[in-house]
A protein has these predicted regions:
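Active-site core segments that coordinate phosphate-bearing ligands/cofactors
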Residues: 3-5, 17, 115-128, 132, ...
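N-terminal glycine/serine-rich phosphate-binding loop of ATP-dependent small-molecule kinases
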Residues: 1-98, 125, 226-227, 231-236, ...
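Residue-level signal for inorganic ion chemistry
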Residues: 22, 45, 77, 104, ...
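Glycine/GP-enriched mid-protein hinge/lid loop-to-helix segment characteristic of carbohydrate kinases
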Residues: 22, 95-117, 121-123, 379
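Short beta-strand-loop/turn "lid" adjacent to the catalytic site in phosphate-handling enzymes
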Residues: 64-102, 130-134, 165-187, 210-213, ...
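A generic structural motif
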Residues: 30-31, 102, 305
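Pocket-flanking alpha-helical
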Residues: 87, 109-113, 247-249
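Alpha-helix termination/capping residues and helix-transition junctions
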Residues: 68-71, 80, 205, 253, ...
């Protein structure tokens, strides 16, 4: 039996074909660009995304066939999809505009209108979503206020989950509970859309799709999709999860002693929880709480607004020499950049708030900064400062989770950074905790595929699927030679935001400095 995990992210999508042991027989990735039509805006073309989806599915299936798989052996496909994105579609599921992404903050005023109608703590108690412009609900209100001509043509507001599943052959658009939990409109205890919040927003429940537990079969591949992908119509389409929850399952988070460092375009900490946590302290810290890929469990997450995106920004603007060397030698440009970074704490520090700050400050007006530069500083020092500072941000949130009672025996890293031994050792030294990487680097694809496995009866539970399929590749342990120096640097870093806050909030023509 074979199972397909499809992972749609912020800047690209990938697909992977696994057997029931978690062995991968084909994979493909395709990148796409974020559309930025104005400062602070971020959109994605559903047409570009769909073309990428069909390409990665076809290519991964072709690779698996070349390795001996037969089309009729593929049992099911499930999805892992970025959260918060939303777009209106008509009755034929044709998009009426590009999707607005979660990193788009244009709906700040609409968020304030919602919290004026329903107190922030009440919204958080219902949805587990700290009120924020990234939520789908305030974004929908922005569309209705600024693009009213679309209202009469709108059949549903959907994420990429419903859109892709419908185009693949699902009977109707269905959104899984973890993904619905990223809309700021879903009641995470009752597992349905919140009538209270929809009334406050002036929206009818009929504008939203049906919701489903991860693992529910929502249809089968259509004849057209099966022919295009080289599969059969017998392939079941299985409700999956939001990308962070699928990555967490693929990283083996089946108890509360394992934390996840999801380090891709953005970086965040995630942990499985046996109980809902939406108290005042968690709200103040910006902790998201929503449905996990294991029914009856919750997923807690705190995300920075950047991660690998910040290193990409530096590469695009300052690393021409490293790009040329990477092309000449056939190496990854980020490996070239990070290997030249000096050892030990950088004398330079970066405040990585280039798109505002995430938890625990949750300050949209905070801005990025590079401090501590001298005439002797080089771009390699700044690269190291980016690596250090992103890890300091993660540590602040990790320690908050430990204050809540979580005791991490292991931090498992997923995403692009997990492929860098240099960065993994740095994380272990700064966090002063064991840090692990996984045999299967595409954890979100594996997580989605394991949901499909359980749905088809390959395993009686996700926990058993994890024990069979998830394997730790390498454990990085803190180096005592560096932990003390990094702890001292971390303590200095914790003062950086407050030191720059007043300056960052000065309004000048053209925006916020």
């Amino acid at each position: 039996m074979y199972f397909i995990g499809l992972d749609i992210g912020t800047t690209g999508c990938k697909a992977a074909v696994f057997d029931e042991t978690g062995a991968c027989f084909g994979r493909c990735y395709e990148e796409f660009d974020i559309i930025c039509r104005a400062p602070g805006w971020a959109e994605q073309s559903p047409a570009v995304m769909w073309d990428a989806v069909t390409h990665v599915l076809k290519e991964s299936v072709a690779q698996a066939k070349a390795a001996g798989m037969r089309a009729e052996e593929v049992r099911a496909l499930s999805t892992s999809v970025l959260g918060e994105e939303v777009m209106p579609v008509d009755g034929d599921y044709r998009p009426l505009r590009d999707a607005i992404l979660g990193m788009d903050y244009r709906a700040d005023e609409e968020t304030k209108l919602l919290t004026g109608a329903v107190p922030a703590q009440r919204i958080y108690d219902i949805t587990g979503f700290p009120p924020h412009p990234m939520g789908s609900l305030p974004t929908i209100l922005w569309m209705r206020r600024h693009e009213p001509e679309l209202i009469p043509r709108t059949y549903k507001y959907v994420t990429f989950t419903e859109y892709v599943m419908k185009r693949l052959g699902a009977r109707e658009g269905v959104v899984d509970h973890p993904q619905a939990g990223r809309t700021m409109a879903f009641d995470i205890e009752r597992k349905c859309w919140s009538d209270e919040l929809l009334r406050a927003a002036g929206l009818d429940r009929s504008l939203f799709c049906e919701t489903a537990e991860p693992g529910r079969v929502v249809g089968n591949l259509s004849q057209e999709a099966a022919a295009e992908l080289g599969l059969t119509e017998a392939v079941a389409l299985v409700a999956g999860g939001q990308d962070q929850t699928c990555a967490a399952l693929g990283a083996g988070l089946i108890d509360e002693s394992i934390g996840m460092d999801s380090h891709g375009t953005i970086e965040g900490i995630g942990v499985m929880s046996s109980k809902k946590i939406t108290d005042e302290r968690a709200l103040a810290a910006g902790v998201s709480c929503y449905a996990y890929t294991i029914p009856g469990r919750y997923f807690l997450m705190s995300s920075s607004q950047v991660g690998g995106l910040l290193l990409k920004w530096f590469k695009n603007n300052f690393s021409l020499a490293e790009e040329q060397e990477a092309r000449r030698t056939g190496r990854n440009v980020y490996d070239v950049m990070t290997e030249r970074a000096p050892e030990g704490p950088s004398g330079v520090m970066v405040l990585p708030h280039f798109i505002g700050s995430g938890p625990p400050w949750n300050d949209l007006d905070s801005r990025g900064a590079i401090v501590g530069l001298t005439i002797d500083s080089t771009r390699h020092d700044v690269v190291k400062a980016i690596m250090d500072s992103l890890t300091y941000e993660f540590k602040i949130n990790m320690l908050y989770y430990e204050d809540m009672g979580f005791r991490f025996k292991d931090i498992r890293v997923v995403g692009g950074a997990s492929k860098s031994p240099r960065w993994m050792q740095l994380k272990a030294d700064i966090l002063n905790r064991p840090v692990s990487t996984l045999r299967e680097k595409d954890a979100a694809c594996l997580g989605a595929a394991m949901i499909a496995m359980c749905s088809m009866g390959a395993y009686p539970s996700c926990e058993q699927a994890v024990r069979a399929c998830v394997k730790v590749d390498r454990v990085y342990r803190p180096d005592p030679a560096w932990t003390g120096a990094y702890e001292a640097a971390y303590r200095k870093y914790t003062h950086l935001y407050d030191s720059l806050k007043e300056f960052n909030h000065i309004k000048i023509p053209g925006g916020t400095v």
